Amino acid sequence: MNSTSLYAAIDLGSNSFHMLVVREAAGSIQTLTRIKRKVRLAAGLNNDNHLSAEAMERGWQCLRLFAERLQDIPQPQIRVVATATLRLAVNAGEFIAKAQTILGCPVQVISGEEEARLIYQGVAHTTGGADQRLVVDIGGASTELVTGTGAQTTSLFSLSMGCVTWLERYFSDRNLAQENFDDAEKAARDVLRPVADELRFHGWKVCVGASGTVQALQEIMMAQGMDERITLAKLQQLKQRAIQCGRLEELEIEGLTLERALVFPSGLAILIAIFTELNIQSMTLAGGALREGLVYGMLHLAVDQDIRSRTLQNIQRRFIVDTDQANRVAKLADNFLKQVENAWHIEPISRELLLSACQLHEIGLSVDFKQAPYHAAYLVRHLDLPGYTPAQKKLLATLLLNQTNPVDLSSLHQQNAVPPRVAEQLCRLLRLAILFAGRRRDDLVPEITLRALNENLTLTLPGDWLAHHPLGKELIDQESQWQSYVHWPLDVR
């Protein structure tokens, strides 16, 4: 592999050290290596902000691992940044001097504002949804809050509170008592209060979380079959569960890994404070943050206004998809959706996911015609899809699995991006669009009227169409039968 196409970003965080190695190919990024080590550097800071020898040694040990991977990458294509703990540590110079010797490249201690800006860039390049956003990143010793529109930030704050420092300060007795949570939340709200007005002034349409705490919450919710949106009610529920566990070493929540458990209660307390102080309705997980911001900065790639479209185009190119046919199916599905939207009230994001499924429905053919829907579902489940959340990927895979043949109703109910009923409706529209676009020519798609009354669909074709299309009639009869097996009434006239 040509080493000039390789880039590395290293983030010396207060809780973990991370390394990301990517390959740049035709304007898109392919992840080659992700390494994360819990170093808990912030835990080595004493009251005088002196970093202990043990904490420094843990950090250097980790960097020796990273250094081996960096040898293959040109130095101008490596960025190493240090954040909150090394901003605070009075003896940071000692740590950084040795770190630079180990890595063989410069280590830059960045300001809180620069960290916030890079986090925002990482989110803007990798996360779909509305353009106007609030980004929250809870680190080990600092929390970044950024508002922005598109690629531009409108306000940037780096606050000195984090999941490691709050753990040491409010849960040092390892007690998960209500009082400890109350103290941690109150302290976090006090830190937030001076910046809350400016953040609210700039406003946001979506809120995105980019930290280990949010990642942990996402994993918990997926494991427990909840939808992926984080809400204050869910956070309070998890807090009560933690309090029931009593002690940090006994913390057990389905979906919470042992690795994340130690700093989970302190991160949770900070997040509850942020939700309460800023009146956040819901939050989803970002597709990337600081490291992605560093990589995209080195590549000088512009922020794509529509990340999901870029992702779909890259995948269509890679799997040699017939884009004319994909567009034909998408146009027909959209037409059907418009005809039933008054009855079914499908939200804009659900429409977008249906059209995404249309664009990708034939990728399974790149493996084999036999079992193409299975191949398509497998590929979508395992591909990196910037702009789509894990739950949205699961929905897309489920729709592609059920694009033809008998319907697997349980799979539509197991995804958690949309309610089961909506997943069923999207699946029905996708199947009909694929069926009627089957001859792969615009002029051979009949004029179809679709009406919905609750779950009953009535499909009306031009007068003599069925008589003149015996194969088409056979396919429609088969589809009606398959839909009837799962109690989806389809009346064809």
UniProtKB/Swiss-Prot annotation:
SUPFAM superfamilies, per the entry: Actin-like ATPase domain, HD-domain/PDEase-like
Enzyme class: hydrolase
UniProt cross-references to InterPro entries, sorted A to Z: ATPase_NBD, GppA/Ppx_hydrolase, Guo-5TP_3DP_PyrP, Ppx_GppA_C, Ppx_GppA_N, PyroPPase_GppA_Ppx
Entry's Gene Ontology BP terms: guanosine pentaphosphate catabolic process; guanosine tetraphosphate biosynthetic process; nucleobase-containing small molecule interconversion
Record-listed E.C. numbers: 3.6.1.40
Presence of keyword Thylakoid: no
Keywords noted in UniProt: Hydrolase
Statement: the UniProt record of this protein carries the keyword Amino-acid biosynthesis: no
Catalytic activity: guanosine 3'-diphosphate 5'-triphosphate + H2O = guanosine 3',5'-bis(diphosphate) + phosphate + H(+)
Gene Ontology MF term list: guanosine-5'-triphosphate,3'-diphosphate diphosphatase activity
The protein's annotated pathway: Purine metabolism; ppGpp biosynthesis; ppGpp from GTP: step 2/2
Similarity section: Belongs to the GppA/Ppx family. GppA subfamily.
Function: Catalyzes the conversion of pppGpp to ppGpp. Guanosine pentaphosphate (pppGpp) is a cytoplasmic signaling molecule which together with ppGpp controls the 'stringent response', an adaptive process that allows bacteria to respond to amino acid starvation, resulting in the coordinated regulation of numerous cellular activities.
Protein name from the UniProt record: Guanosine-5'-triphosphate,3'-diphosphate pyrophosphatase
Organism from which the protein derives: Salmonella choleraesuis (strain SC-B67)
This protein's encoding gene: gppA
